[in-house]
Amino acid sequence: MPSFAALLPVILLGAGAVTAMLAAPRLPGLARWIAGFALVAASVALALRLGAPDGLSVLLADDRMSRLTGLVVCLSGIGSLAFLRPDGPSKEGPALLLLATLGGVVLTGAVHAASLFLGLELITLALVALFVLPLDRPALEAGYKFLILGAAAAATLLMGLALGHAATGSLALEAFGGREALLTFAAALLLAGLAFKLALVPFHMWTPDAFTGAPGAAAAFAGAASKVAVVTALVRLDAVGLPQVWALGLGTFAGVSILLGNLAALRQDGVARMLGYSSVGHAGYIAAALATGAASAPAAALFYIVTYAPALLAALCVAALIGRATRISDLRGIVWRRPLAGAAMAAALVSLAGLPVSAGFFGKYVIFTALIEGRAWALLALAIAGSALGAYYYLRFVALIFRRAPDPADPAVRWPERTLLGAATAIILLLGIRPDLLLDQIRAALP
C-alpha cells in the first residue's frame, strides 16, 4: 500500500475539487483561490518527493517518473488556471480543472487497467464540461466532437483492456507483454484509444475546434497537461514489451500525423487553429520516437512533451489575449503594443519550431537522435520535412510580431497571465541553454 505522502497530491487535488465545487455557486472568486492553493500544494508535495524511494501498489506506481511528470501536469494545471477570468461564465471551471489535473496525476502512475481507464476518463469528462461551459456555438461544437470521439476512444480502450485480461488473466499492465493473438488485438485497440488522447491522425479531428472554440483553460489543459500524462502512459506501456503491432501502429500514426499535421497548419491564417493542427505534428514526433524501440526513445519522448508544454501554454495565452479567432495579420507589431506578450509569443513559436536557443531545439535533437539510433530512416525523413515546414509557418508569425505598426498600446495584461507568460518564457530560454537540468532528471526517472 502506498504511503500517505505518496497519496497526498491525489488527496489534495480531490479535496480541492470538492471544496471548489461547493464554493463556486456563491463564492466563485474563492473557488479560484482554492484551486490555485490545491495545485500549488500538490506541486510542492510532488517536488519534495522527487528523490524518494520507489514504491508500488496494485493500481499506482510511486516512482520518480510518476512524480516528475505528475509535477509537470500540476504546473501545467496552474498555467491553465491563469486562463480562467473572474468575470467569465465558468463558475465551475476551477473545480473541473482540478478534476482534470487529478486524472492526469493518476494517469502518470497508472500500472493497472483500472487506474489507466480512471485517469483517462477523469481527464476526458472534466474537459468535456470545460469545453461547453460558455454555452456558445463554437464551444458546444468543440465539446460535442470531443465527447463523441472520446466515447468511441473509451470503448475501444476498454475492449483492448478486456482482451488483454482474457489473454493473461490479469489487469496489471505489465502482464500484457507477449505475442499471443489476443494480445495483438489488445495492443492495437489500446493504441487506438490512446491515440485519440494524444491527437494522432486519424483521431485528431477534435483538436482544431478545441483550440479555437473551447475556453482557453480547456484548450490549454487538453494541449499541454493531458498530453504529458498520456505520453507517460505510452512510455509505461512501451516498456511492457507489447506485440509488434504496437510499434508498427505507432510508426504509422506518427508518419501520417507529422505529414498531415504540418501540411494542415501551413494553410492556416488563424493563430489558434494553426496551433491546433501543428500540435498533431508534434504528437507525431513523440510517437515516432517511441515506435523505434531505441533505448533513448522514452527519455526523448518525455523531454519533448515537457518542453512542448510551456511553449504551447504561452502561445495559447497570447492567442487568448488577442482573441483566438485572430488572423495572422492581427499579430503585426504586438511586441510594441504588449511587449511581454509579444516576446513570450516569439519565444514560444521559436521553441515550437525547434530553433536555437530554445527548449524546442533540444526537443527536436533528442527525437532525431532516437530515430537515428533506431534506424527509422523513413520516419527521420518525415520528421525533418515536418520540422522544415513547421519552421516556415512559425517564422511567418514571428516576423509579423516584430514588424512595427501604428496601433496604440493595448490594455495591460492581468497579473495571472503576466506570471504565466514570464514563467513559460523563462523555462523555454533556460532549457534552451541548459537542457541537462531536465534531461538528467528524466533519465534518472526511467528504469
UniProtKB/Swiss-Prot annotation:
Catalysis performed (reactions): a quinone + NADH + 5 H(+)(in) = a quinol + NAD(+) + 4 H(+)(out)
Subcellular location: Cell inner membrane
Transmembrane region(s): 4-24, 27-47, 68-88, 92-112, 113-133, 146-166, 181-201, 215-235, 245-265, 280-300, 302-322, 342-362, 376-395
EC number(s) reported in the record: 7.1.1.-
GO biological process: ATP synthesis coupled electron transport
GO CC terms in record: plasma membrane
Keyword Cell inner membrane: yes
UniProt membrane topology term: Multi-pass membrane protein
Keyword Transmembrane helix: yes
InterPro entries per record: NADH-Q_OxRdtase_suN/2, ND/Mrp_TM
Function comment: NDH-1 shuttles electrons from NADH, via FMN and iron-sulfur (Fe-S) centers, to quinones in the respiratory chain. The immediate electron acceptor for the enzyme in this species is believed to be ubiquinone. Couples the redox reaction to proton translocation (for every two electrons transferred, four hydrogen ions are translocated across the cytoplasmic membrane), and thus conserves the redox energy in a proton gradient.
HAMAP family: NDH1_NuoN_1
Subunit structure: NDH-1 is composed of 14 different subunits. Subunits NuoA, H, J, K, L, M, N constitute the membrane sector of the complex.
Name of this protein: NADH-quinone oxidoreductase subunit N
